[in-house]
Amino acid sequence: MKKIIALFMCAAMLLCFAACGNSEQILVAEKESAGESVACENEDFADYTYTAVDTQAKALMEVNAGTADAAIVDYVMSIGSIGAGTDYEGLVIDGEGYSEEEYGIAFRKGSDLTAKVNEIIRDLKTSGELVNIAKNYKLDGILLGDEKSEAFAQAETDSDYEYVMNKGTLVIGITYFAPMNYENEAGELVGFETEFAKAVCAKLGVEAVFQEISWSAKETELAAKNIDCIWIGMTITEEREENMSISIPYMQNKQVKVVKSK
């Protein structure tokens, strides 16, 4: 119901914006993302016509191709995707950004695995291993991972921890976007979250198995046990905390407007 109301409000605001603005500028963002919320709710974009796209990568492609005038994407994504030395050298961030937020890993509601992973995140941060991984992708300045949480205690019934340990794998739902999860020139899966997840799994003593999923189907995939966690640069929100078990925050983020450099 919340999602339906939110979508209705978004549509209403977009109609209002379209009525008030005379510009034909096109704004794009990933469907059902934090970027879409900014596009729908922020008055800075009242003169834009908004169009949803499948992925953040597609949003940047549209701006680069000239089929859109601006995109709203994660600041984290922009670090590895635009500017000098990237495929989108002609794209830049316009302004200071919107919607300060934090990333977390999502597990099934009530999962005892969350507390165990929280312990490992803090250990990796304290040892410096997580910082070193972040430095490889120029993300160390926005790294978190120090927050306290409940101590791990294995559940007596329906233990996700036991389930994962018995099968020896942690199936991780991902989407592809640099610098979090992407393929290098050799076709190997790399990225901050890829290395981070492997480090956590090494501490758990299980194999990290990465499975690409659709952003819009992430909750369904998790509930159906097609994946064991959602690890895709996911913003922590009250609604998600109500429906899933979320790890401690591991990275700061914000939404930014990306345009072609002048």
Regions inferred by a protein language model and the residue ranges of each:
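Positively charged n-region of N-terminal signal peptides that target proteins for export
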Residues: 1-9
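C-terminal motif of bacterial Sec signal peptides marking the signal peptidase cleavage site
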Residues: 16-19
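Bacterial signal peptide processing site
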Residues: 21-23
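Acidic, polar ligand-binding/catalytic clefts
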Residues: 25, 29-32, 82-99, 198, ...
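Pocket-lining segment of extracytoplasmic ligand-binding domains
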Residues: 25-89, 93, 111, 256-262
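Ligand-binding clefts/hinges and TM-proximal coupling segments of bilobed small-molecule sensing domains
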Residues: 36-51, 90, 94, 121-162
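Extracytoplasmic small-molecule ligand-binding "clamshell" domains
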Residues: 42, 49-53, 60-62, 74, ...
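A bilobed periplasmic-binding-protein/Venus flytrap-type ligand-binding module shared by bacterial periplasmic
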Residues: 100-120, 256-262
